Regions:
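Conserved N-terminal phosphate-binding loop of PLP-dependent enzymes in the Aspartate aminotransferase
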Residues: 1-466
Length: 466
């Protein structure tokens, strides 16, 4: 079974294989973005239209990943194309203030009013880096509390306990907390300023904030745990962090780079942080990052004040990204968010039903237009649960991913699923059918390698390929 799935993929994608070999002559392993590589080689994409992408062999796929949540409007949306092509004739990055900076900011503040003041950078990585620097400058403290398995980009502190294999470890500051696990290349001295806490564990957060509160500059959290498994925050968890950070005099930072598509989360649920980061959708398909929040905190950057915090960058707030982002925000409001919520709810319900119908233990998690699929009968509550659900199942997950590609669906190897606003409900249903067929076909493999995933009392049904 495993061999047939791989052979079908390789038979259909010889041009991608050739492209991968050529890329490897310039790029390590033929890759420049770790999340998009998978064995035996990734598809090389040459054209995108609407909700579909075409590979180098001419095959079209329904895009169910939306560039890891960075896109919302589909590919080549007419308004975004017009904004970018028009701005190209007026200048891309002129090296001085432009009206687009406050025009885009006004649009974004209308969507997220907690951004009383904001600044621009080039990515979510930069945005979270600057949010923490802002918190440290404002509080005069150094310690940062982050979620074990939380992903905040590729700067040094963001790569501590970020669901990547560590080269070395360090003990936690307090007993009972996760050990500190910096990724390769991150200094232990950097990791020494990080305290990791389990997601959705308010007692652990209370222990840290009450025990180390006077040293803590910020608590940084994703409202939905992203790379750590798509885990939603438990009811009351983020409100509890809000209360605890106020008591400790620390700033609460929401990393909403991925969860703007949910409303953003803070607006939908009414829990307001001190600082927020955004990226992905706000750039309309081009690189753009935002960090901002309380006016008194962001006043540290006011250049008319004595000794402002220095923040610069040749492409921060560049005109091209802001033009695309403004067009994207003009077409991203209540109706679009509600449609993404509808698609996500439909997808998760369908995936759970599909797994049950073929007698395979599998559960979907997520919120709104952000979903994950996991093997196992119980959905994860934190990143440690996600790690346990994935342990020893890398080949199974790879085979499921390749099966979906063979069926014409572009998804993420680690299970992330995101839709575009123009994605049709029928496309979601077709993806659910593809999952069901793939899981059915994988039952013999699962019976040999992962029998614990077969639900023996479930009367699975035969599924004919569409």
């Amino acid at each position: 079974m495993a061999g047939r799935i791989r052979e079908a993929y390789e038979h259909a994608t010889p041009a991608s294989a050739t492209a991968s070999h050529r890329a490897a002559r310039s790029l390590p392993g033929g890759d420049t973005r770790s999340m998009t590589w998978y064995p035996p080689y990734p598809l090389f994409l040459v054209q995108c239209e609407g909700t579909r992408v075409r590979d180098a062999d001419g095959h079209w796929y329904e895009d169910m990943i939306a560039n890891y949540g960075a896109l919302a409007h589909g590919h080549n949306h007419p308004a975004l194309v017009a904004a970018v092509t028009g701005q190209m004739t007026r200048g891309t990055a002129p090296g001085g203030p432009v009206p687009l900076q406050y025009e885009h900011a006004e649009r974004l503040r209308a969507l997220n009013p907690s951004l009383e003041r904001l600044r621009y950078c080039n990515s979510g990585t930069e945005a979270t880096m600057w949010a923490v620097r802002t918190a440290r400058a404002y509080t005069g403290r150094d310690l940062v509390v982050k979620i074990d398995g939380g992903y905040h980009g590729t700067h040094d502190w963001g790569q501590v306990n970020a669901f990547f294999a560590p080269q070395r470890t360090a003990p936690a500051r307090l007993a009972g907390l996760p050990e500190i696990r910096p990724a390769a290349g991150v200094a232990l001295s950097t990791a020494g300023d990080i305290v990791a806490i389990p997601y959705n564990d308010l007692p652990a957060a209370a222990t840290v904030l009450r025990g180390l509160g006077e040293q803590i500059a910020a608590v940084v959290v994703e409202p939905v745990l992203g790379v750590g498994g798509g885990v939603p925050s438990a009811p009351g968890y983020l409100a509890g962090l809000r209360r605890l950070t106020r008591e400790a005099g620390a700033l609460l930072v929401f990393d909403e780079c991925a969860t703007l598509r949910l409303g953003p989360w803070q607006v939908k649920h009414g829990v307001i942080p001190d600082l927020t980061t955004h990226s992905k959708i706000v750039g309309g398909g081009l690189p753009l990052g935002v960090f901002g929040g309380r006016e008194d905190v962001m006043a540290l950057f006011d250049p008319s004040r004595p000794h402002p915090v220095h923040h610069a960058g040749a492409f921060g707030g560049n005109s091209l990204s802001l033009a695309a982002g403004s067009a994207a925000l003009d077409h991203f409001g209540t109706d679009e968010i509600a449609h993404l919520d509808f698609l996500g709810d439909r997808l998760r319900a369908g995936l759970d039903a599909a797994a049950a119908s073929v007698g395979v233990a599998g559960r979907s998690v997520g919120e709104g237009g952000l979903s994950y699929f996991h093997f196992g009968s119980t959905p994860p509550r934190d990143a440690a649960d996600t790690a346990r659900l994935r342990a020893g199942r890398a080949e199974l997950r790879s085979l499921l991913h390749l099966s979906l590609l063979n069926a014409g669906f572009l998804t993420a190897p680690h299970g992330l699923l995101c839709q575009h606003v123009p994605t049709a409900p029928e496309s979601v249903d077709a993806l659910v059918d593809a999952y069901g067929n793939a899981l059915h076909d994988l039952r013999p493999y699962i019976a040999v390698h992962h029998p614990e995933l077969l639900e023996k009392d479930a009367g699975h049904v035969h599924r004919d390929a569409p």
